[in-house]
Amino acid sequence: MSQFTVHRNQHPSTKSRFPLLLDVQTDFLNGLATRVVIPLMPQAASKSQKMDKLTPVVQVDGKRYIALTPQLSGIAKKELGPVVADLAAHRVDFINALDFLLTGI
């Protein structure tokens, strides 16, 4: 598992709304059975979810997705789907979004 990799969401009840999950957990905690993820929603499906600093927009396979940072959650590693992208190039955007969510700064 690597921080800032994007996985397919395999959960039957959420995968249609949030097809991708962004792993934001540090690699130093790979020994845990869980990973912290941010759901990615297709930008076209979102009406009012966009807040520039809190919900950065990224592109995966030619499609734009909104990172729904306020919906941060934990998931068992075994439930993560295959890796489809690496968004480490957007690291600063995700760290800033998490910082804003947790500290308001």
Regions found by a protein language model. Give the residues of each.
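Compact nucleic-acid interaction/catalytic patches
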Residues: 3-6, 14-57
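C-terminal terminal-subdomain/extension
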Residues: 58-105
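A generic "functional-site adjacency" signal
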Residues: 1, 15, 88-92
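Residue-level detector of secondary-structure boundary/capping sites
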Residues: 12, 49, 85-89
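Residue-level marker of positions within ordered structural domains that often coincide
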Residues: 12, 26, 100-103
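Residues that cap or initiate secondary-structure elements
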Residues: 13, 43-44, 64, 73
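Short amphipathic alpha-helical segments, especially helix-boundary/capping motifs
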Residues: 1-2, 31, 70-75
